């Protein structure tokens, strides 16, 4: 493929700023998702039964940790190892492919969470839908194991296919001025094909997520109309559960669309135009989205909120004890 590539130089200040933002995003994302993981995993250690939603959140936090780690490695590769004038190296392409697989697993887990909310909150009247909701509630652990197994198989197959495929590059250089050259790079097409394949396989879970979220929205509308007719109590547990579930699902939808658009835009920026600054902006957006949704999940989950309150109270008491200890030592002096 013949592409006209303009080489954009990136200053040291821009690379340092991007790396600092990447470290900050990685730290925030790692802490929020590790917190969700540890709170739920601690119940497993204590042999306390996990609810279906907690199991999904546990798997979701693990996939997000992988996402943040891969995006941080991508940022390091982009700033220090990937040169603009050269084709994409193997390690950078492998990191991007693994991110696509982790992102697809993240979408499947969100679809499972949406189905679980539907089975728990919607009051079905049709016999088939009642049986389907009961089946989803009973088979959620098997669904999670299937998602993990499929993600592992896809990872092994994609990595094996990528590294077993012959890689070659034909580059024709035609200097038109000081910073423009004409490159024919066949090697970079591997990343484009892998990106397209992963996005096509993301269509079924995305449609499943949209359908289940739409059903939950319709159920909320019906419930609100019923409340207006039969009751005047504004604090209804079912209504609050509907609203919390929709907040987490709508926030995931917004963050996923933003992250997917950034990933989609980054491909031509990287392969065709070699615009490293544009790719840096896209990677920064992609890293911020999982952290934002993790914060929404923490704010909407009672167990996670209690854990946050406990940690804050412990930190406050520790600071107070230290302050009292310093005051006592000064008094003795």
Swiss-Prot record:
Q: What else is known?
A: Most taste cells may be activated by a limited number of bitter compounds; individual taste cells can discriminate among bitter stimuli.
Q: Name one Pfam family in it.
A: TAS2R
Q: Which GO CC terms are listed, alphabetically?
A: plasma membrane
Listed name of the protein: Taste receptor type 2 member 38
Its taxonomic path starts at: Eukaryota, Metazoa, Chordata, Craniata, Vertebrata
Give the Extracellular membrane side ranges: 1-17, 77-94, 164-190, 273-276
User: What does the UniProt entry say about where the protein is found?
Assistant: Membrane
Q: Where are the transmembrane segments?
A: 18-38, 56-76, 95-115, 143-163, 191-211, 252-272, 277-297
Entry keywords, A to Z? G-protein coupled receptor, Glycoprotein, Membrane, Receptor, Sensory transduction, Taste, Transducer, Transmembrane, Transmembrane helix
Alphabetically, the GO molecular function entries are:
bitter taste receptor activity; G protein-coupled receptor activity
Cytoplasmic membrane side:
39-55, 116-142, 212-251, 298-333
Glycosylated residues, chain numbering: 178
The entry's family comment says: Belongs to the G-protein coupled receptor T2R family.
What does the UniProt function comment say about this protein? Receptor that may play a role in the perception of bitterness and is gustducin-linked. May play a role in sensing the chemical composition of the gastrointestinal content. The activity of this receptor may stimulate alpha gustducin, mediate PLC-beta-2 activation and lead to the gating of TRPM5.
Q: How is this protein positioned relative to the membrane?
A: Multi-pass membrane protein
């Amino acid at each position: 493929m013949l592409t006209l590539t303009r080489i954009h130089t990136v200053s040291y200040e821009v690379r340092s700023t991007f790396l600092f933002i990447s470290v900050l995003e990685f730290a925030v994302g790692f802490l929020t998702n590790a917190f969700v993981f540890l709170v739920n995993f601690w119940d497993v250690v204590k042999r306390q039964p996990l609810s279906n939603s907690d199991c999904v959140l546990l798997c979701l936090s693990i996939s997000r940790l992988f996402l943040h780690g891969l995006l941080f490695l991508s940022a390091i590769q982009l700033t220090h190892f990937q040169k603009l004038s050269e084709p994409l190296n193997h390690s950078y392409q492998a990191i991007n492919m693994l991110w696509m697989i982790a992102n697809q697993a993240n979408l499947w887990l969100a679809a499972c969470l949406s189905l679980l909310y539907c089975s728990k909150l919607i009051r079905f009247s049709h016999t088939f839908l009642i049986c389907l909701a009961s089946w989803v509630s009973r088979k959620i652990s098997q669904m999670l194991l299937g998602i993990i197994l499929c993600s592992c198989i896809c990872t092994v197959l994609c990595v094996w296919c990528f590294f077993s495929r012959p890689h070659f590059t034909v580059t024709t250089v035609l200097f038109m001025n000081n910073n423009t050259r004409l490159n024919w790079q066949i090697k970079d097409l591997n990343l484009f094909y892998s990106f397209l394949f992963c996005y096509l396989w993301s269509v079924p879970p995305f449609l499943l997520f949209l359908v289940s979220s739409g059903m939950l929205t319709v159920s909320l509308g019906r419930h609100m109309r019923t409340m207006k007719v039969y009751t005047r109590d504004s604090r209804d547990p079912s209504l609050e559960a509907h609203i919390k579930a929709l907040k987490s699902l709508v926030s995931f939808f917004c963050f996923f669309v933003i992250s997917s658009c950034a990933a989609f835009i980054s491909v031509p920026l990287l392969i065709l135009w070699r615009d490293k600054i544009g790719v840096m902006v896209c990677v920064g957006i992609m890293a911020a989205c999982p952290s934002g949704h993790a914060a929404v999940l923490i704010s909407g989950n009672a167990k996670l909120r209690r854990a946050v309150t406990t940690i804050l109270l412990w930190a406050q008491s520790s600071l107070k004890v230290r302050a009292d200890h310093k005051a006592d030592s000064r008094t003795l002096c």
